[in-house]
């Protein structure tokens, strides 16, 4: 079965010792109020991060900090999403340019580098250190928080806990989860409600209109706003009654809007979160009554049944596609009486049907399921192909995975780039050039990734390769 999962390693995060008394150095040249794409670590120039310092940053007081982990080492992306909240609430935000899905030591090294460097450069509030991540980066953030005991809260986007780590009463951090309704990990984030509650972990899970991606700016801002609230509740931030009242009214309006739009499941979760989040900060009796009323309503029960049916159909389609892939790869056909197709014909038919459903202009059950299934299959194949290519140099198997990834989603240029790499490694110049051409035609624009890759050395003198590079230089 083809699955996408975070690498299961049980290494313990080893923190580099630090003290708030460390000298704050080399910050004068870093602009405030602007995203800086690359800050090299003072102790290791191979480690870098994207950074946002609030415009009013001063070393005269300590600041909350949010460390971000992207599955593809794109440090800029999370900083872009969280910089508005950073400016509004006075947080330092940084995203590693090194951390990525793969060997756990890569994540640990990036984490240690960021942790050490920020304490050397900036005035950090060690009581208010947070971590966020997307997909495999979300699992990395959770694992770090569970291991180091220094993280006050985690914002997990597009994924939850590592497969070998479950919510526990020993965990000290609060948890904010976010997932798009079209995310193939949507069910995973939603299913965390029960284990988080049983473990006594203060939490909120928010959904948004989107796929498997970092959350949009409003959701990222809501996550930081919620963390501010929890800091006040936990005594790590001075109580601000105006902030508490305004946040209460905002969340209450959002819940009522969802309920009025008959989005009962989302409304119920928000009401439930309101009661839990504000208990101890203000009277929540009215909302607790609302939670009980809505929890027993026919409307919510119907919404839950519909959501569960979506998840079941998603899982059934995922299983069916994986079976068809295995049958096609093995040269065998399955259930040939089904619609008169064997595996080789049935697989592209199902993929075509799902792509049509995924392109629908309006949200629907069919569109959500199609997008979840296609994106989940693509990511699984893509990550598998890259692992076989880079870590194992198993070019033939990598070609098989990446080629299928391009069939699942023919609009993603990155898959064609890595497929070209695999073909080049397998000494198939013709297909390597074809795939590289397709990658550029579909939007691949990073000429440096091609010129720096030794796998393409055998192609440099080919006229088609030179045409590709000339086209990139004109862009």
What do the PLM-derived regions correspond to, one by one?
Residues 21-63, 107, 136, 251-254, ...:
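A domain-start/cap signature at the N-terminus of enzymes
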Residues 190-193, 197-274, 285-302:
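C-terminal catalytic histidine-bearing segment of alpha/beta-hydrolase fold enzymes
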Residues 55-62, 104-135, 149:
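Gly/Ser-rich "nucleophile elbow"/oxyanion-hole loop immediately N-terminal to the catalytic nucleophile
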Residues 78, 118-121, 127-173:
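Primarily recognizes the serine-hydrolase "nucleophile elbow" in alpha/beta-hydrolase
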Residues 176-179:
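Short beta-strand/loop motif that positions the catalytic acidic residue
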Residues 256, 386-387, 421:
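Residue-level recognition of tetratricopeptide repeat
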Residues 61-71:
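Short beta-strand element of the alpha/beta-hydrolase
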């Amino acid at each position: 079965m083809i699955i996408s999962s975070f690498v299961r390693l049980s290494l313990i995060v080893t923190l580099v010792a630090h003290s708030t008394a460390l000298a704050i150095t080399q910050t004068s040249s870093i602009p405030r109020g602007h995203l800086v794409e690359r800050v090299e670590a003072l102790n290791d120039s191979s480690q870098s991060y994207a950074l946002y310092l609030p415009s009013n940053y001063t070393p005269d007081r300590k600041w909350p900090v949010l460390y971000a982990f992207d599955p593809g080492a794109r440090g800029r992306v999370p900083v872009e999403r969280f910089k508005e909240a950073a400016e509004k609430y006075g947080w330092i935000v940084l995203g590693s340019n090194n951390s990525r899905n793969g060997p756990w030591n890569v994540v640990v090294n990036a984490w240690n580098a960021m942790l050490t460097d920020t304490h050397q450069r900036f005035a950090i509030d060690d009581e208010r250190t947070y971590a966020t991540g997307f997909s495999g980066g979300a699992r990395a953030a959770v694992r770090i928080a569970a291991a180091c005991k220094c993280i006050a809260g985690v914002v997990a986007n597009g994924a939850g806990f590592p497969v070998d780590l479950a919510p526990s009463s020993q965990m000290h951090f609060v948890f904010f989860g976010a997932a798009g309704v079209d995310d193939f990990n949507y069910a995973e984030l939603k299913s965390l409600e029960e284990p988080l509650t049983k473990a006594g972990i203060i939490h909120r899970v928010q959904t948004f209109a989107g796929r498997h991606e970092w959350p949009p700016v409003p959701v990222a801002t809501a996550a930081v706003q919620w963390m501010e609230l929890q800091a006040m509740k936990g005594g790590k931030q001075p109580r601000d009654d105006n902030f508490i009242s305004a946040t209460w009214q905002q969340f209450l309006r959002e819940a009522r809007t969802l309920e009025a739009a008959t989005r009962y499941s989302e409304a119920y979760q928000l009401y439930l979160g309101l009661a839990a989040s504000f208990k101890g900060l203000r009277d929540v009796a009215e909302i607790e009554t609302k939670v009980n009323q809505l929890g027993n309503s026919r409307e919510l029960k119907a919404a839950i049944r519909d959501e569960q049916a979506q998840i079941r159909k998603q899982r059934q389609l995922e299983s069916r596609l994986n079976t068809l892939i295995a049958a096609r790869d093995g040269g065998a056909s399955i259930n040939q009486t089904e619609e008169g197709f064997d595996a080789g014909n049935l697989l592209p038919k199902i993929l075509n049907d799902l792509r049509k459903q995924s392109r629908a202009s309006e949200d629907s059950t069919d569109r959500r399921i199609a997008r979840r299934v296609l994106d989940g299959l693509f990511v699984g194949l893509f990550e598998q192909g890259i692992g076989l290519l880079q870590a194992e140099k198993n070019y033939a198997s990598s070609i098989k995975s990446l080629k299928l990834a391009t069939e699942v989603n023919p609009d993603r240029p990155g898959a064609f780039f890595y497929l070209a790499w695999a073909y080049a490694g397998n000494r198939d110049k013709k297909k390597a050039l074809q795939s590289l051409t397709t990658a550029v035609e579909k939007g691949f624009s990073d000429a440096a990734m091609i010129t720096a890759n030794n796998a393409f050395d055998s192609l440099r003198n080919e006229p088609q390769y030179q045409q590709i590079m000339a086209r990139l230089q004109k862009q």
